[in-house]
Each structure stands twice: as C-alpha cells, then as structure tokens.
A protein has these predicted regions:
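N-terminal first-folded block
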Residues: 1-35
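A short, acidic/glycine-rich surface segment
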Residues: 14, 38, 63-67
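C-terminal structural segments of small proteins and small subunits
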Residues: 56-87
Length: 87
C-alpha cells in the first residue's frame, strides 16, 4: 500500500470487460512530506476520490479483492481518501 495524490482521470471507450463501470484515476505516489517519489500510475477508484485529493492505493490481490473480482484486470485500487497526515 502507498500514499498518492490524484492528478487526473482516464477516459476510455474500449476496455477489458472487468473494467466496465470502473473509474480510473491517475495517481502520483508521494512520501510522508507530500513529495513525489516516482512516476505516475493509473489506479481504479473504489471510494469516489477526486483530483487533488491524497489517497491510499493497494496493489495486486489486495486491489482486486476490493472489487471482489479476483480474475479482473485491476492491478491498483484507490482504497481510502486521506484526511490528513503528519510526520
């Protein structure tokens, strides 16, 4: 699991069936100071997060289990909106 800031959204018309009805967001992984730590990624949103919000992102089986779809094409999922963080 890692913390990230949502920087954008992804619009798609043709997709793998398991992505139907899912909202994909562009997330920028950040450290405890809110500084960027690596390249942006795409994650499937499970909590209704919006651009500019800090979120927690899960990967792999943990991400797929959020949607109860163990065989889906989902690799990363936004699982929480961060209210605050401090170091």
């Amino acid at each position: 699991m890692f913390m990230a800031k949502i920087t954008g959204s992804v619009v798609f018309t043709k997709k793998e069936d398991s992505l139907t009805g899912k909202k994909l967001m562009i997330v920028q992984p950040v450290d405890a100071n809110g500084e960027n730590v690596r390249s942006e990624e795409v994650a499937c949103d499970s909590v209704g997060a919006g651009i500019g919000e800090y979120v927690l992102v899960a990967r792999g089986n943990a991400a797929r289990s959020v949607f109860a779809e163990p065989n889906s094409a989902i690799d990363s999922a936004i699982i929480a909106i961060v209210d605050s963080f401090d170091k």
